[in-house]
Swiss-Prot record:
PANTHER family: HOMOSERINE O-ACETYLTRANSFERASE
Protein's recorded name: Homoserine O-succinyltransferase
Name of one Pfam family that matches: Abhydrolase_1
Family: Belongs to the AB hydrolase superfamily. MetX family.
Site (Important for acyl-CoA specificity): residue numbering on this chain: 323
General function of this protein: Transfers a succinyl group from succinyl-CoA to L-homoserine, forming succinyl-L-homoserine.
Enzyme Commission no: 2.3.1.46
HAMAP family from the UniProt entry: MetX_acyltransf
GO molecular function terms noted in the UniProt entry: homoserine O-acetyltransferase activity; homoserine O-succinyltransferase activity
Domain of life where this protein originates: Bacteria
Catalytic site: 156 (nucleophile), 321, 354
GO terms classed as biological process: homoserine metabolic process; methionine biosynthetic process
């Protein structure tokens, strides 16, 4: 992406917000203080009514749009969605991207130094949930004197975080856009997460999560976890279209080396991810996914759980997403309608599987553009 494009955010930089008030977590643990790394795009208007919070997915972070001056190839993960003239138009909205608590891109997490020990938190960093993140979003908004977000938007785990905030702080959210998400993980999804965790936990370099002091990193386990996850983010059709049974070298080698293009692709994705992500954070994020279940305290009644919500909702799903299928989005829509809340829903034709929410798609983007254009400030 050229930084000169008219619809580009251009050069951006990350900032850091510090919080000294102790944060009580759902696990019972307490963080005496913490920091959140964030980026903003656009300008906060005079009455602070145009703030939009972007919630990231498992492997995402605060770098949602734009590029860095010292690394112009590092484009924000939702750059096709956010910018001047884009579906989330920064000429109208003040957009905020936050690296969640427990992340590994600057916010307080397992790789951070524990002031009490002088060492990295590592495995001692407490598990965090979407409810804990919702608390941090509210505190962040308070620091900016933002009484209410014009919209909270997220895909996948980010969609769950958006729902959580709309439920836990209903007076702070006017609109919630939930994309490719679910109100709870299925048993199959929990199983996928556990297999990914086991790949990391059983890596000899994991050292019970204290690999920092051993000078190691469970790269093999993290690599396998990412490869498994990536398979679930794609669809059979997209894999067939992109790779089929194509061989790297044109003929069978009759050995156990990487032969098929799909194998090469997965190895590349795994290697790249293992170089950039922290294993303890990966474990933590998968547990946040597993634990998300707003109906749990309501005897499994999702409609009762959503009785707290006040926001208007846009819920989007993708036809080929088998990780978070359209049926799961329809469960959310039903719960919202049961509470007579305003909700719009669309099931978007796509062959790209769960990753569709990150893709450039005219129909998908037009739906979000139209919804955002109708938000009055």
């Amino acid at each position: 992406m050229s930084t000169q494009d008219s619809d580009s955010i251009g050069i951006v930089s990350a900032r850091r917000a510090h919080f000294d008030t102790p944060l009580s977590l759902k696990s019972g643990a307490v963080l005496d203080s913490y920091e959140l790394v964030y980026e903003t795009y656009g300008e906060l208007n005079a009455d602070r009514s145009n703030a939009v919070l972007i919630c990231h997915a498992l492997s995402g972070n605060h770098h949602v749009a734009g590029v860095y001056a010292d690394n112009p190839k590092n484009t924000g993960w939702w750059n096709n969605m956010i910018g001047p003239g884009k579906p989330v138009d920064t000429r109208k909205f003040f957009v905020i991207g936050i690296n969640n608590l427990g992340g590994c891109h600057g916010s307080t997490g397992p790789i951070s130094i524990n002031d009490k020990t002088g060492k990295r938190f590592g495995p001692d960093f407490p598990l965090v949930t979407t409810a804990d993140w919702a608390k941090t979003y509210v505190r962040f908004a308070d620091q900016f004197s933002i009484d209410c977000f014009a919209a909270v938007i997220g895909g996948s785990l980010g969609g769950m975080s958006a729902m959580q905030l709309a439920l836990d702080a209903p007076e702070r959210v006017r609109h919630a856009i939930v994309v490719a998400a679910s109100a709870r993980l299925t048993a199959q999804n929990i199983a996928f997460n556990d297999v990914a965790r086991q790949a990391i936990l059983t890596d000899p370099d994991f050292h019970d999560g204290d690999y920092y002091s051993h000078g190691t990193h469970p790269r093999r386990g993290l690599r396998l976890a990412r490869m498994l996850g990536h398979i679930t983010y794609l669809s059979d059709d997209s894999m067939a279209s992109k790779f089929g049974r194509e061989l790297r070298n044109g003929s069978l080698a009759f050995n156990y080396d990487v032969e098929f293009q799909i194998e090469s692709y997965l190895h590349h994705q795994g290697d790249k991810f293992a170089d950039l992500f922290d294993a303890n954070t990966y474990l933590l994020m998968t547990k946040a996914l597993d634990y998300f279940d707003p109906a749990q305290d309501y005897d499994g009644n999702l409609s009762a759980a959503f009785a707290r919500a006040q926001a208007d909702f846009l819920v989007l799903s993708f036809t080929s997403d088998w990780r978070f299928s359209p049926e799961r989005s329809r469960d959310i829509v039903k719960a919202l309608l049961d509470n007579k809340l305003n909700v719009s829903y669309a099931e978007i034709p796509s062959s790209y599987g769960h990753d569709s929410f990150l893709m450039q798609d005219d129909y998908y983007h037009q739906l979000i553009r139209a919804y955002m254009n109708n938000i009055a400030l």
